[in-house]
Amino acid sequence: MSLFDTINAGGAQLLGIAWPTVWAIVRILVVAVVILLCVAYLILWERKLIGWMHVRLGPNRVGPAGLLQPIADVLKLLLKEVIQPSAASRWLYLIAPVMTVVPAFAVWAVIPFQAEAVLANVNAGLLYAMAISSIGVYAVILAGWASNSKYAFLGAMRAAAQMVSYEISMGFALVLVLMTAGSLNLSEIVGSQQHGFFAGHGVNFLSWNWLPLLPAFVVYFVSGIAETNRHPFDVVEGESEIVAGHMIDYSGMAFALFFLAEYINMIVISALAATLFLGGWDAPFEFLSFIPGVFWLVLKVFALLSVFIWVRATFPRYRYDQIMRLGWKVFLPVTVIWVVVVGFWMMSPLNIWVK
């Protein structure tokens, strides 16, 4: 019996009928705290990694090797005043930052950390994740409109156009996963990648979806970078022409909430990519399966997050028209064609996804 099973059994005996509610709240709080810590140190890792790419040290003053820098940043933002523009719509202006964070946290309800370790093991988990993660753009639009600033509103309009352009391609990439796994349940999708010719010979990583669905994997991940408004797709903020886009009139913790949502969404995109295409908690080789599955999931997510940062440090920012062209004229045709190819592949004698 695992530690969580022991706690669950002991709590049920102690609190009786109230325990399921208490246990659900405890699990939600634990996941939320872990995500917040991951965001804090993801920002530090980003600054460190980009510093090394620039041949400099990065943050190294607060605490040993700069490890307390995230805490100093949080304290600074907590102490800053939230200054509201006089022409802004008060309540919408204040609600918008909260609306960006809530969907980012809500997606974690269906992401499995390892077998049987998920907050809500729902059968439509993939559909839920895609629907919830798409809501955040409405908060960006709301922030741009409520600020009553032409720069903020222009950034919000860019966010809407960018979301529409890349959401369709992401949707088709996820349709391919649904076709091959035959389920919308994220745990079952991971399970569908744990069998096949290569998995039977102990080489698990060659049975994961990244290999047969490589175009969809690339489209999904690059579209995820665009959906999170990360460099080189950060025209929503557009420092060179619209200063900071929808965030230009925000300060203090209201400003910090937008960045919190951005980094949580980075982790969400990486976690979903690892779950859908990289085997989730599955070990790359059978002889390593004794290591807890959550370790492999964290390792894959960390690697994908490092790619996020590497892309930021490497590529110049695209023009707005180039971003639209990539979404509509490259990614959308590629995913549609690959849906057709995989459909015929599954109906042929060469079908590798036979259950």
From Swiss-Prot:
It holds the Pfam family NADHdh. GO terms for molecular function: NADH dehydrogenase activity; oxidoreductase activity, acting on NAD(P)H, quinone or similar compound as acceptor; quinone binding. Its main location: membrane. The keyword Cell division does not apply. PROSITE patterns: COMPLEX1_ND1_2. It is a multi-pass membrane protein. It catalyses: a quinone + NADH + 5 H(+)(in) = a quinol + NAD(+) + 4 H(+)(out). InterPro entries: NADH_UbQ_OxRdtase_su1/FPO, NADH_UbQ_OxRdtase_su1_CS. It is found in: Cell inner membrane. GO terms for biological process: aerobic respiration. The keyword Membrane applies. Keywords: Cell inner membrane, Cell membrane, Membrane, NAD, Quinone, Translocase, Transmembrane, Transmembrane helix, Ubiquinone. GO terms for cellular component: plasma membrane. The chain crosses the membrane at residues 25-45, 91-111, 126-146, 170-190, 205-225, 253-273, 290-310, 330-350. Belongs to the complex I subunit 1 family. NDH-1 is composed of 14 different subunits. Subunits NuoA, H, J, K, L, M, N constitute the membrane sector of the complex. This is NADH-quinone oxidoreductase subunit H. It comes from Burkholderia ambifaria (strain MC40-6).
